[in-house]
A protein has these predicted regions:
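Short amphipathic alpha-helix that is part of the acyltransferase structural core
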Residues: 1-35, 39-47, 51-56
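Conserved beta-strand in the GNAT
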Residues: 49, 56-66, 71-74, 79
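A conserved beta-turn-beta hairpin within the catalytic core of GNAT-like acetyltransferases
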Residues: 66-75, 85, 105-109, 139-141
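Conserved acetyl-CoA-binding loop-helix of GNAT-fold acetyltransferases
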Residues: 80, 86-99
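Conserved GNAT acetyl-CoA-binding A-motif
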Residues: 94, 101-116
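Conserved catalytic-core motifs of GNAT/GCN5-like acyltransferases
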Residues: 112, 124, 129-144
Length: 150
């Protein structure tokens, strides 16, 4: 597995296409959720992704600077390609994303995610704690979760 870290400006255009395709495959097609994925946050975000030995993007996450979606740094668009699931790749993806977020910004900062409710327990294993009530985002139940690095 090869890991890549980029700003929007430094993303190779073929990789940008591949990660947008992966996001669409999972969030729109697999989850049967019609929504606008391109939300104008990608340009100011940091992009972390993994490619398999064939060079295909199989995991992706974006890091949003504090003040973009939340007062804190946030991690979103967490995706692992279907054939790459069940191999702890999602855990490695999140750990790498958290470390990069804390390196980019203040290590003491909390990290916020908007988690699909069916993944609360999975994110909980990584140290995230649910906040507030469940809500619908694009017809899918979600909860805000926060991980403190204090």
């Amino acid at each position: 597995m090869q890991w890549h870290r980029h700003t929007f400006e430094s993303l190779p255009k073929n990789d940008l296409y591949a990660l947008l395709r992966l996001r669409s495959d999972i969030f729109v097609v697999e989850q049967d959720c019609v929504y606008l994925d391109l939300d104008n946050h990608d340009q100011n975000s940091y992009h972390l992704y993994a490619k398999n030995t064939e060079g295909a993007v199989v995991a992706y996450v974006r890091i949003l600077p504090p003040g973009t979606a939340y007062p804190q740094v946030s991690i979103g668009r967490v995706v692992v390609e279907k054939s790459a699931r069940g191999k702890e790749l999602g855990i490695e993806l999140m750990v790498r994303a958290e470390e990069w977020a804390w390196d980019l910004f203040e290590r003491e900062r909390d990290v916020v995610i908007m988690a699909q409710s069916y993944l609360l327990q999975w994110y909980g294993r990584l140290g995230y704690v649910a906040q507030g009530e469940e809500f619908l985002e694009d017809g899918i139940p979600h909860r805000i979760m926060i991980k403190s690095n204090k």
